[in-house]
């Protein structure tokens, strides 16, 4: 995906210092998300946590939702690496181990970006077209490649139809995402991928 911003909101080319300030604002937002709801974040709080002014915040982002969208783009880049798991050959003799590696990689991305991905889904569910498009740009390739993997394991001659494989991939993706979105403390009590062993 290679998400990169080269200009600020005023159309000026971002140099090293500008890129660093933008990165600090994004890092501060991510830190604040660990203790605050995304709907409670303010540009002032983010700028203060980043050690800059709110005027600087608006040089790089339109509003808090804009910085959360930028963080969602980074999460999408990480999720594209998980999707690439489907591009390599899976050993059918140890298919459960292959599936577990996929689930663990998926959970790892969610652990890194949980608050941002929850917000992405919230805004998509509320009808924000930017967040909906971003979510679908992640979901569709994942589900398509997952369905293709299901078909390769149990081809049409084996009784599974293409539509069934897509339905199974959709349900499995939804289940994986729901578990990954769950509070980490709950996951550490033995729910999720550790139960698959």
Q: Would you name each region that the model predicts?
A:
Residues 1-20, 154, 158-161, 188-191:
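N-terminal intrinsically disordered/low-complexity leader segments
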Residues 13, 71-98, 117, 152:
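Amphipathic alpha-helical linker/stalk segments
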Residues 18-29, 46, 71-79, 146:
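Generic hydrophobic, amphipathic alpha-helix propensity
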Residues 24, 28, 32-66, 70:
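Helix-turn-helix
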Residues 33, 40, 67-75, 120, ...:
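Alpha-helical DNA-contacting segments of helix-turn-helix folds
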Residues 42, 117-121, 132-133, 158-159, ...:
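Short, hydrophobic secondary-structure boundary micro-motifs
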Residues 70, 84-112, 165-172:
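Hydrophobic alpha-helical connector segments
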Residues 77, 81-83, 108-112, 119-122, ...:
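Amphipathic alpha-helical packing segments from all-alpha helical-bundle domains
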């Amino acid at each position: 995906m290679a998400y990169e911003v080269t200009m600020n909101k005023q159309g000026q080319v971002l140099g090293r210092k500008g890129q660093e300030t933008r990165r600090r604002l994004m890092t501060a937002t991510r830190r604040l998300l660990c203790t605050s709801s995304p709907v409670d974040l303010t540009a002032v709080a983010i700028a203060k946590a980043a050690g800059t002014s709110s005027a600087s915040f608006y040089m790089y982002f339109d509003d808090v939702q804009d910085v959360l969208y930028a963080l969602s783009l980074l999460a999408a880049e990480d999720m594209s690496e998980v999707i690439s798991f489907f591009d390599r050959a899976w050993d059918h003799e140890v298919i459960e181990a292959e599936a577990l590696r996929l689930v663990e990689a998926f959970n790892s991305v969610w652990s890194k970006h949980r608050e941002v991905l929850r917000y992405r889904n919230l805004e998509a569910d509320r009808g924000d077209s930017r967040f909906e498009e971003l979510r679908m740009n992640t979901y569709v390739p994942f589900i398509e490649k997952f369905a293709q993997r299901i078909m390769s394991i149990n081809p049409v001659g084996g009784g599974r139809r293409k539509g069934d494989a897509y339905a199974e991939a959709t349900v499995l993706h939804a289940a994986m995402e729901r578990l990954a979105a769950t509070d980490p403390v709950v996951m550490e009590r033995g729910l999720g991928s550790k139960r698959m062993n």
